[in-house]
């Protein structure tokens, strides 16, 4: 199994995409831990990172979510524009250490990725997982802390 493929199961986005700042501590914990349990039961690997829905976080989220919170430094707005060219243009603004937000359930985003990946590789970038990027930069991820980029 490749490192990138295995890392997919080390991150999660909660069970039902609820805004973690607007639910109780018990529900917040359930959203994250139940999802981690499901991922682990299917893959044998427990998730190690969380991307909070909407990027929503506050002190309560930071205190109760026992994982690093992975946000983004570039939002392609693919969910809003639904335009492949726009998504490509935004993603290609990335510089070393950026985290680019894209939604893998959209066909136009998948089409954009088919253009973005070779373009970034041609520019000399190595595409890695979030965990690999932070490790390469010597940045230790801490539970409850939010990260937008690795630099």
Label each region the model flagged.
Residues 15-148:
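Catalytic domains of cell-wall/extracellular-matrix polysaccharide-remodeling enzymes
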Residues 1-5, 9:
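Single conserved hydrophobic/aromatic residue that forms the stacking wall/gate
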